[in-house]
A protein has these predicted regions:
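Surface-exposed extracellular loop regions of Gram-negative outer-membrane beta-barrel proteins
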Residues: 1-21, 25, 37-51, 55-65, ...
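C-terminal beta-signal and adjacent terminal beta-strands/loops
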Residues: 119, 158, 221-231, 250-298
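Membrane-embedded beta-barrel scaffold of Gram-negative outer-membrane proteins
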Residues: 49-62, 67, 87-149, 154, ...
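Gram-negative outer-membrane beta-barrel transporters
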Residues: 108-119, 137-231, 293-297
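Solvent-exposed loop segments that connect transmembrane elements
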Residues: 3-35, 68-87, 125-139, 175-188, ...
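Residues on the lipid-exposed face of transmembrane beta-strands in outer-membrane beta-barrel proteins
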Residues: 36, 44-48, 98-102, 151-155, ...
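Outer-membrane beta-barrel strand-turn architecture
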Residues: 40, 48-52, 92, 102-106, ...
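Short sequence motifs at beta-strands and strand-loop junctions characteristic
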Residues: 32-40, 89-92, 141-147, 190-197, ...
């Protein structure tokens, strides 16, 4: 019975027309009890195998998320400039991508990557603004653009047993137009979209006189700053960070044993940070962790 037109069993007065809003037009509405979406999306890809070791492709694709209902529908800002809609519409994305997959240097280097542009229309966003309602609600808050470059590689240098691997992404995001309250500001970054993220690892393996295989590995992970939301009262800056992991061990066909140290510098890297309900809530990565790992292959 938790339907839009009647609010909720515990607090029907939140949504019930004629009780909350005081707006005769809104109070007269017959609020829907379901959200529906329909339409057609497409995807097209062209690829070119320049050689057995090099392939290029271009992709055009579309996507969407279905609409949803809002519990506090009809509630407004004090000046009446914004009113929560009963239904949040679908948001849509159009993606343009050029990419490549390569095997180079006689198989010693594999490098894949892509350049992409994404057009976002009517981005669905969850909003908490006590000046409007003491409940979360959603709206199509903004139009936005995303431009990026990403890639990954594996490289085997002329040192037996050594492998170097990594991945990276570069992002440029921007809210082009605010479609909702003044809580969303054009020109700002999208949430959880650091300008740069990267990781690189080096692993060295060697044969032992016992017939086992020894290994040692180091990894460095880094991220640029980002923001936790596009809603100004709820957002927080998440600082850039970097941290390292190391591990060493012995293995054979039947088992693997290793010691590891994750987050050697005990970095408090923030992965979530917001001010919802006017209380800052921060989530960080695990602190420095030292452990032993043993795995048996059956």
């Amino acid at each position: 019975r938790d339907q839009q037109r009647f609010g909720t069993n515990s607090s029907a007065a939140f949504n019930k027309p004629g009780v909350v809003t005081g707006n005769p037009f809104i109070d007269e509405l017959n609020y829907p009890d379901k959200a529906e979406s329909d339409g057609v999306i497409g995807k097209a890809t062209l690829s070119w195998n320049k050689s057995d070791d090099v392939m290029y492709y271009v992709t055009w694709s579309e996507g969407f998320r279905p609409g949803l209902l809002n519990r506090p529908a009809g509630q407004s800002t004090p000046d009446g400039s914004y009113t929560v809609r009963p239904v949040t519409d679908s948001d849509e994305v159009t993606n343009y991508e050029f990419g490549w997959k390569t095997v180079l240097q006689d198989g010693r280097l594999r490098f894949n990557g892509s350049v992409f542009m994404v057009d976002v229309s009517g981005l669905q966003t969850t909003i908490f603004d006590p000046s409007i309602a003491n409940l979360f609600f959603s709206d199509n808050a903004a139009d936005a653009d995303i431009t990026g470059l990403e890639g990954d590689f594996i490289y085997y240098p002329n040192i037996e047993g050594l492998m170097i691997s990594g991945a990276f992404s570069l992002l440029d995001t921007e809210i082009k137009k605010s479609l909702t309250t003044s809580d969303v500001v054009a020109g700002r970054d999208l949430a959880f979209a650091p300008g740069m993220q990267a990781n690189v690892a080096a692993r060295y393996e060697w044969g032992m006189s016992s017939g086992n295989l020894g290994h040692i590995q180091g990894q460095l992970i880094a991220s640029d700053k980002s923001y936790s939301d596009i809603i100004e009262p709820n957002k927080a800056k998440q600082d850039s960070y970097s941290y390292a992991n190391v591990r060493a061990g012995i293995s054979n066909d039947g088992w693997v044993a290793e010691i590891y140290i994750d987050n050697i510098t005990d970095e408090r890297a923030e992965i979530s940070n917001n001010y919802v309900f006017d209380r800052q809530r921060v989530a960080v990565i695990r602190p420095m962790t030292i452990g032993l790992r043993y795995k048996v292959n059956f």
